[in-house]
């Protein structure tokens, strides 16, 4: 049975800039904001919308070595994107289903609320490092790094 874990964070960046790096430019941005984890991101199939398949290749010291994800939700008007792990990554660590959905909302001109929903399932006991509490910390760290990246004028 799929379970959900929800969290949120406020970032001091414009909604449009954050949406661009989360939805369109992440193939080039992810390795820049997570250089200690991600070697590169490859577009395998699709045009960036629903059905697009990506491979996140991790550095040699990171295990597992890759994660294949599919964009399962993409709504430009509501600024919502969902990425489901379909191979490797968390699925190699005991989870049978893992999806992260980001929904952006403008708080004010230079402040954006990011709602994060993690949907997950597992067939057996899972390692502590892949519990939604732990994986959500990684997701929030990624969002903070995106905030820093955008604040430094890198986008």
From Swiss-Prot:
Keywords: Allergen. GO terms for biological process: abscisic acid-activated signaling pathway; defense response. GO terms for molecular function: abscisic acid binding; cytokinin binding; gibberellin binding; protein phosphatase inhibitor activity; signaling receptor activity. Trans-zeatin 1 binds at residues 22, 69, 139-142. The keyword Transcription does not apply. Trans-zeatin 2 binds at residue 67. The keyword Transferase does not apply. It holds the Pfam family Bet_v_1. Gibberellin A3 binds at residues 67, 139. One of its GO terms (cellular component) is cytoplasm. PANTHER family: OS08G0374000 PROTEIN-RELATED, PHYTOHORMONE-BINDING PROTEIN. Belongs to the BetVI family. Binds the cytokinin trans-zeatin in vitro. Binds gibberellin A3 (GA3) in vitro. Monomer. This is Phytohormone-binding protein CSBP. It comes from Vigna radiata var. radiata (Mung bean). The lineage of its organism: Eukaryota, Viridiplantae, Streptophyta, Embryophyta, Tracheophyta.
């Amino acid at each position: 049975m799929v379970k959900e874990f929800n969290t949120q964070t406020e970032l001091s960046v414009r909604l449009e800039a954050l949406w661009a790096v989360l939805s369109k430019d992440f193939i080039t941005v992810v390795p820049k904001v997570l250089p200690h984890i991600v070697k590169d991101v490859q577009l395998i199939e699709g045009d960036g919308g629903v059905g697009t398949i990506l491979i996140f290749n991790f550095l040699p010291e990171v295990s597992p070595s890759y994660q294949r994800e599919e964009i399962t939700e993409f709504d430009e008007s509501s600024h919502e994107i969902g990425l489901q792990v379909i191979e490797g990554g968390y699925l190699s660590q005991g989870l049978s289903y893992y999806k992260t959905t980001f929904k952006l909302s403008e708080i004010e001109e230079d402040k954006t609320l990011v709602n994060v929903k993690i949907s997950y399932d597992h067939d057996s006991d899972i390692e502590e490092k892949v519990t939604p509490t732990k994986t959500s910390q990684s997701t929030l760290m990624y969002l903070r790094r995106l905030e820093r990246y955008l604040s430094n004028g890198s986008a």
